[in-house]
Amino acid sequence: TGEKPFMCTKCGKCLSTKQKLNLHHMTHTGEKPFTCTECGKGFSRNDYLKIHQTIHTGEKPFTCIECGKGFSINRTLKLHYMTHTGEKPFTCTECSKGFSTKRDLEIHQTMHTGEKPLTCTECSKGFSTKHKLSIHQRVHTGEKPFTCTECNKGFSRNDHLQIHQTVHTGEKPFTCTECSKCFSRKELLKIHQIVH
């Protein structure tokens, strides 16, 4: 029916069930009773823990019908699918650039405002998004949740793991438009292009 009779006394948000209200309360208390057995990271909800655990298992049950790329959660697949359809329903009021998700738009808008509302408790460095702060905090914690299946080397970021894996695969996806020489990393291509 769409009825949401349970209201949070902290922020006024209304939810449809008492259970959802209890889960929501954890966003205010910071309580994280669900813990990953692999890395010890805590979560406020069990479904968030299950999504996180796919980082360790490598499980990607949701597959894009266009390109065959696998995803650990259905929502990420739906967002990815927009790269094929070109759908960008969220538009920046400053520069008219379009985005496929509201979150991407919000992240982009911090470029215009220069806003960095999130601060690292360890070093006071400011960040525009929770995701960027979370990645940065691994510098302090030493957490490396992304592991190479070939050599077991750990990485703090997934993109760093993907770059590393080209050592094993021999893949060189970055090609020089001038001479067709291939490189495993974008930075190496940029250094090479100075020659031309």
UniProtKB/Swiss-Prot annotation:
GO terms for cellular component: nucleus. One of its GO terms (biological process) is regulation of transcription by RNA polymerase II. A zinc finger (C2H2-type) spans 6-28, 34-56, 62-84, 90-112, 118-140, 146-168, 174-196. It is found in: Nucleus. It comes from the Eukaryota. One of its GO terms (molecular function) is DNA-binding transcription factor activity, RNA polymerase II-specific. It holds the Pfam family zf-C2H2. Keywords: DNA-binding, Metal-binding, Nucleus, Repeat, Zinc, Zinc-finger. InterPro entries: Znf_C2H2_sf, Znf_C2H2_type. The keyword Cell membrane does not apply. PANTHER family: ZINC FINGER AND SCAN DOMAIN-CONTAINING (PTHR23226), ZINC FINGER AND SCAN DOMAIN-CONTAINING PROTEIN 20 (PTHR23226:SF377). May be involved in transcriptional regulation. Belongs to the krueppel C2H2-type zinc-finger protein family. This is Gastrula zinc finger protein xLCGF3.1. It comes from Xenopus laevis.
